[in-house]
Each structure stands twice: as structure tokens, then as C-alpha cells.
């Protein structure tokens, strides 16, 4: 009987294919075991909406759909509690918030500055500031300037002034130099000056005091203090220097933020170089 057409594996090929089959079966069994044993309650909340399969398996889908609907193409609100002569506030404004966040994320965030910080409103209504009377005067000026700028961002000018103060430039000189450098118009200058000598200046300081006291759900413990979308958390403050990275993670829109794309490409490039060597 002719047996040349039997459907048998040749001796040289059979072990290879069997090994591949064993590996495939093992992978399927392992995947099933991982899926069966995953503890959804132990997954960090920041990862809940990062993968559709994860959302479906752990029951996160409904929450994630609501989150996406509420945040898609929406600017992220950043509120920063500051005080004028605080070195850490000056560093944050001049080295992080203005040169990195504002310049690269201006179309994706709303930035609000609250110049009051650790000051206290005394029983007689006067305000006592952590770094003395000069700080109170500058806080008041910054509040008036912010109000006078209306729809324009005060951050470039305030960052300029704070950088000058870091260099021990007199406040009046710093204001004049920065107004000239950033071409602040006469109307805004007059509005700011009028605010300083009127009841409005005091009202704005009291408003800043109330805004600082009423942050939620946790009170500020130091400055600068960063609040994201109205939420004040002590645990977040340790990540102030990672704010650009977090904004890249949090923002959800039709188009990626150019800064984030560039940062990701640079990261992959560095990783490729390391893996090559």
C-alpha cells in the first residue's frame, strides 16, 4: 500500500511546530489567568479610563464616558495661591508657570492667580502679610492689575515683575520696566492706579482672602498652592514641578497639544538611544 501521502509531520519540523503550539496555549492560559485574577479595586484611579478593555472589565465605562464628555476639548482650570515676596512663589511663576505652562499651554488652560497667600485679615479689618507691609502693598497692586487686565492674561507682566524683585530691583522700578517691556497701555495703568487708591483695591484683597480661605476640599498649607479644576489637594502639591507632564496626561481634545507631542518624541528618541547602547 502506498503511504507516501500520509498527513504526518516530518521529524525535523514536528518539534518546532509543537513548541510554538505549546507556547501559544501557555500564553492563552496565562492571559486568561491574569484576566481572571485582576483586582479592579486595586487599580489606581488615574488608570481607570486609559483602556477600553479595562473599562469594560472593571465597570469603569459609565464613569469614563461621563468624564470624557465633561472634559473633551475643555480647558483645564489652574488656580495658584501666591504672595508677592515669597521666594518659592517667585520661582514657580518665573521658572514654571509662565515660561513653560503659559507659553506652551495657553490655548488649553485657564490660569488664575490669587495674590494673598499666608496673609491674615485682623479683627480691625487690616491685613498682615507674611513678608511685611511691602508684600501687602504689592499683593494689592497685583490684585488691582489682574482686575484691570480683564480678558488679557496678567501672568507675563507679573512674572516679569516678580523676576525683577528676585534680582532686588525696587518695586516701582520693576513695574515701570515691565510695563514698558510688555507695552502695557495707559488705560490699564490708569485703571490699576485708580484701583489702588480706591475702595476697589481693599475689596479685591478681601475677595482674595475669601477665595484663599474657601479652597476645597483641603485648606492650603503653604504657597505656592496649585488648585486644579476647583479641587485643592495637599497630595498634588508635590507634583507642581511635573505640571506640564500632568497637563499632557489630563487634556482630552480632538488635537494633541504640540508641546506634548514634541516631549513624547524626545522621550522615545532618548529611550531608543539607550536601548541601542
Curated annotation (Swiss-Prot):
Domain of life (superkingdom): Eukaryota
Location within or outside the cell: Secreted
Glycosylated residues, chain numbering: 77
Entry's Gene Ontology cellular component terms: cytoplasm; extracellular region
Signal peptide bounds: 1-35
Keyword terms: Glycoprotein, Secreted, Signal
Pfam families with a match to the protein in the record: GILT (PF03227)
Example of a GO MF term: oxidoreductase activity, acting on a sulfur group of donors, disulfide as acceptor
Primary location recorded for the protein, binned into one broad class: secreted
Family: Belongs to the GILT family.
Name of the molecule in the record: GILT-like protein F37H8.5
